[in-house]
């Protein structure tokens, strides 16, 4: 069927900010879809609230709205644009839920807007647990024994009938949000209550647990003519019971017989056909390892995280094909862009093994509950490709960037046998490394399989890796064992450890003996047809399929897996850098390990290498390609951390040179640079042991800010107020040594602001100055940022411009740099300089109209700012006000304290733009799901040092008609100052205490600040935890609460008697 001509304009809904369970894969999918629709001649309108996306660039759609993804705002855009159709299936769970909501309001019918891709009935059948259960019964597809509940009492009754364990699955939620495995009544009460609260339709499925079965996924496509195919099948390393987003996953499935594969394939195709889905769909199934019995677990009637993985694993562009199916094209009418010959109806075939490994945030959140279950906790993932399971697994391990380069963790050898058993039975994020340790201690595959329910086949692969290690240890400096180990994915670094040599010694020996990787093409057809797409992975085999180009090329290093502190913003910068390289006449080569991102879409660069970002793997690509140079400054700290080793290997680093990178990152050199150009910074010093730390803190005075050097996202950064806390920090938070010094600075409580600057070595362009709403002490990534600044005097602005220029010139910056300032008593201090692109680049690019990463790349390649049409100094400011607001995923991470501080905790961001600060703030709060009504009840629980400041705030809320509740100390203070307050009991004082009030549903917001006192801290953490669980807007910074008050005041009318 030819494409539809009765529709001309299509609105695409994006997925909004990055949260756990919904990350960069939707930027990749949305970008592909918008470009595919434009390619077919449709007018595309995009709405998304996330500025850190390629999808929201002006070139991707005909009109782009970066507005809150709420029914209110999307309805306004629908009325303004009057599209013929709406495509919600590329916006994740957010897109689906929004489509449902818009349909319920009647606006789609009113405006005659058709829903494309997947009909509402299909969304309902897949997402509504009751309808899904009925459909599976009608299809005679087995599902676990289950019941739909709308109350905790119903859940308890059903569990008493079928027995524990049971799994709770809330309807219409993302990444298993609110769900979990329950083994008793107490757990079931708790998880069901949360699940019902988080489900937009107040519905949960309680099902008999089948934890321990194999978990298999099928990524399927279907068109309007009922043509359907399986793009990819995947098998989880972990059994059912651990969310697939938190599991290691292999593609294709490794342990299925042909009969089992056909059984599950047929079931998946039957389901997509019954749902009449037009586009992509993900089917998750559980297979009994001891029989042919299987169960259907879940169906996602949309493009998902697994779709992105399947696309990158096979090369089949699922989102692009899904978008074209939505406008009427059929699978047998579309050419597969990888081969350029076969049709999209042709099922991909793989002659390699893909491993996906999740990246967890527990290096940031040491207090978090690391146990894995049905609720997702990973922030990102890596993918690796090899010819064997062992090779792809070991490549994935060293892609994670968690300080390991093999499937082992050295510290685990110190764990006693009893603890090791517990770590194996109760799965955590690091179970893979405990499995390796258990095998080293002589545990058998059968024993481990019994304990973990992991298939013996996978455990045998781990044992094989161990056998290769032993062989290497016995036969040092021999060619055959080295070659054998490289074929199975061993890194030079691991071999160096086993041979007691340096990594460079192993590399030299390897090259001397002709042991080099070859690069194979990802072609969707197992080399049956010639492929046109230069998308490669390394392996140690015969025949290299990647030939170095005769044209001049530049290698750009990506930023690896998404984690807190280094997110999608860096991928945005990478993609823009590639565009500029190509525009300058060079071939652009990307190297990255993240399957979720736009940068690893094979159509973005001239060549894509899907490889770990380690010195060894990068040098292997450089040896083959011989690029003119390597660009590091868009790959976040991942790429910057490789600079020194690449420089030592005489690799040309383009942009700011390594010696100047070191002058910005090394504390003593940086202090000298600031001193030389007469720029003030907080008093501070580098220390290498506990005694030095105490001496420095005593000299500069408490409070102090302590942090390790060379980190991103403020990892392990703390404000310390007393000597005892400083010692605790030095002993537990960091590994301190002369190689890994700790920085101790005087903590200045002032107005924080930051600048992204672009320099050609002569002139310095400052696109704009961002002013933080929260005072210094809250990490810049967790602060709300306003552009243009609203409260900085002209003198302060001029000083910031002056200091930025001086720093850029002194540090010989070529390209981008980010500088953070704090202003106190009219003095501007420099807190930090990052000699690279920062996470604010997409935001500032969008609000100023300057394609910052492209401009910086052109400067790196030799252009000047003047040649590009830019002047030295501050760029003209925007007529609108723009607010960037952070997004957190605390509801997925139990036991993580949501109190904001110097260590970054946010996973994503949104933007609010309008003609005034109040309107922009309102949009930013709405986009970040911080909806506070015009009146209601608000709780204040405030530390002593903040009571005076909070009084003015409480009076403001009271004047608007809010009823003020406060814990005893705060209440007494408010009453002394004539503010009417309802006193509530602290935790444990009486039965009707603060937590019960919060669970009652009568509270509209909680304002909580904390002291460093241990008892207060525990109570405060519990209050914050309950607020997050109950979905109550929580403010832990008075500055953020003041911003919300300002919004509410701007929307209220004054009411006065005569």
Swiss-Prot record:
Q: Where does Mg(2+) 4 bind?
A: 832, 834
User: Which residues are ATP 1-binding?
Assistant: 129, 169, 175-176, 208, 210, 215, 241-243, 284, 298
EC number(s) per entry: 6.3.4.16, 6.3.5.5
Q: What residue spans carry the region label Carboxyphosphate synthetic domain? A: 1-401
**An example of a Gene Ontology BP annotation on this entry?**
glutamine metabolic process
Q: Which domain of life is it from?
A: Bacteria
Q: Which InterPro entries match?
A: ATP-grasp, ATP_grasp_subdomain_1, CarbamoylP_synth_lsu, CarbamoylP_synth_lsu_oligo, CarbamoylP_synth_lsu_oligo_sf, CbamoylP_synth_lsu-like_ATP-bd, CbamoylP_synth_lsu_CPSase_dom, MGS-like_dom
Instruction: Give the residues the record marks as binding Mn(2+) 1.
Output: 284, 298
Relate the protein's function as given in its record. Answer: Large subunit of the glutamine-dependent carbamoyl phosphate synthetase (CPSase). CPSase catalyzes the formation of carbamoyl phosphate from the ammonia moiety of glutamine, carbonate, and phosphate donated by ATP, constituting the first step of 2 biosynthetic pathways, one leading to arginine and/or urea and the other to pyrimidine nucleotides.
Quote the protein name from its UniProt record: Carbamoyl phosphate synthase large chain
Q: Which organism is it from?
A: Streptococcus uberis (strain ATCC BAA-854 / 0140J)
